[in-house]
């Protein structure tokens, strides 16, 4: 089963089917929440997730580190009422009674946290004391800064799994984001290496991204021009490519990238984004924001 088929099968589950993917017997755990949260629509209910970075099995006392999720279902009515992501606080320890997900084969592309989930049965305690998890939290809060000889100083945002910094691009400073797995230093090196490959040929990449965006979006920009309140200059592919201004690049560890350009008000302040990979070149361009 490929990733798309797997996701469709998951989204088609009823609540009863979804709950059967967890062990029948509940266990007591202490869990340290950190990172994001979200909710996904399934078949007749919403699956709410809050991410954790470690938990302790209260029966064995064993500490388990690594990304995971605590999850619970809510109805459409509860979702529409709002506030479903406010139930738990980040960087807090909770004592829970919960059912662990039953291990099963997942396709490539699924995150490790999808196999490390607990369905909440009962919240037993908030801000529960746990020295082991407090140590994990202290380490999590410790800033991680990497200094690269080409990319300069990069600061890790552990919640977003992203290094952030600035780099010189054709004589101008732009923002840089390296999208990584915060727990896997190999991805740190891969993302830095990929970005340096692009930087080494920045003149070619800059031209390719501008040309691709101009081919894809000039006609649309001309349509927007016609709706302007005041007279604006004619837009050609050449002028489009010249007018957009690169503001930031996001690079993945696998060499996939997104480049974000200022639109010079051709789309009334929307962002022009070019996408691609180091292997395939620029593959698409669109407006966002």
Where are these regions (language model features)?
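C-terminal structured interaction module
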Residues: 237-289
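Structural detector for short beta-strands of small beta-barrel domains
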Residues: 5-57
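OB-fold/S1-family single-stranded nucleic acid-binding modules
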Residues: 97-136
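OB-fold and OB-like beta-barrel modules that bind single-stranded nucleic acids
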Residues: 31-34, 91-101
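Short, structured beta-strand/loop micro-motifs enriched in basic residues and often containing a Trp
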Residues: 49-80
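Contiguous hydrophobic, core-forming segments of folded domains
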Residues: 134-205
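Long, charge-rich alpha-helical interaction segments
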Residues: 177-236, 240-243
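Short nucleic-acid-contacting surface segments enriched for D/E, G, S/T with interspersed K/R
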Residues: 77-97
């Amino acid at each position: 089963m490929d990733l798309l088929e797997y996701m469709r099968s998951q989204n088609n589950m009823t609540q009863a089917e979804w709950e059967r993917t967890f062990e029948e017997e509940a266990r007591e755990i202490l869990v340290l929440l950190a990172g994001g949260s979200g909710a996904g629509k399934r078949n007749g209910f919403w699956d709410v997730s809050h991410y954790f970075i470690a938990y302790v099995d209260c029966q064995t006392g064993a500490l388990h580190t690594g990304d995971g999720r605590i999850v619970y279902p809510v109805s459409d009515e509860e979702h529409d009422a709002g506030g479903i992501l406010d139930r738990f606080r980040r960087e807090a320890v909770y004592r829970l009674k919960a059912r662990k997900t039953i291990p099963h084969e997942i396709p490539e592309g699924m995150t490790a946290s999808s196999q490390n989930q607990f369905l909440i049965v009962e919240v037993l305690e908030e801000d529960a004391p746990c020295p082991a998890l407090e140590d994990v939290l202290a380490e999590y809060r410790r800033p991680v800064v990497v200094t690269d000889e080409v990319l300069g100083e990069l600061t890790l945002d552990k919640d977003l799994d992203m290094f952030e910094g600035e780099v010189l691009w054709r004589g101008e400073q732009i923002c840089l984001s390296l999208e990584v797995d915060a727990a896997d230093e190999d991805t740190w090196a891969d993302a830095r290496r990929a970005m340096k490959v692009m930087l080494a040929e920045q003149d070619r990449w800059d031209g390719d991204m501008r040309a691709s965006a101009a081919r894809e979006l000039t006609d649309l920009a001309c349509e927007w021009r016609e709706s302007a309140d005041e007279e604006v200059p004619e837009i050609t592919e050449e002028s489009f490519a010249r007018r957009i201004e690169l503001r930031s690049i996001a690079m993945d560890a696998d060499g996939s990238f997104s480049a974000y350009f200022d639109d010079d008000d051709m789309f009334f302040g929307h962002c022009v984004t070019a996408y691609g990979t180091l292997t395939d070149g620029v593959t698409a361009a669109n407006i966002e924001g």
